[in-house]
UniProtKB/Swiss-Prot annotation:
This is Large ribosomal subunit protein uL16. Binds 23S rRNA and is also seen to make contacts with the A and possibly P site tRNAs. PANTHER family: 50S/60S RIBOSOMAL PROTEIN L16, LARGE RIBOSOMAL SUBUNIT PROTEIN UL16M. One of its GO terms (biological process) is translation. GO terms for molecular function: rRNA binding; structural constituent of ribosome; tRNA binding. Belongs to the universal ribosomal protein uL16 family. Residues 1-22 are annotated as: Disordered. GO terms for cellular component: cytosolic large ribosomal subunit. It comes from Polaromonas sp. (strain JS666 / ATCC BAA-500). Residues 1-13 have a biased composition (Basic residues).
Amino acid sequence: MLQPARRKYRKEQKGRNTGVATRGNSVAFGDFGLKCTDRGRLTARQIEAARRAISRHVKRGGRIWIRVFPDKPISQKPAEVRMGNGKGNPEYYVAEIQPGKIVFEIVGVPEELAREAFRLASAKLPLRTTFVSRMIGQ
């Protein structure tokens, strides 16, 4: 699964996920992309599950790019622990997603195959997505 190799600080504040994606909002590497239209978080497990769904559907054809990286640690306290006594330990990593962000890209497969692969992948993600293709002249 994806996670940072090293971090300067183990824990991070919660923060607020606002605005729309100004970077990573167009198909850059492949011919087709999966664009999020919702705001939220994608965990490393969800990204990996979606990647596997795409890989299994396109079999050996095509090349896949993952355009998001889970670099934000989410901490949790153990079950049945009383409030207080500091912040919990980092349990997993998430990628903050704004509307318009491209999550996956693919090249080397027909459009219908890419569409179906992304449909299967979007079922693994908690956000609404849409299928996009590269603009002419890009």
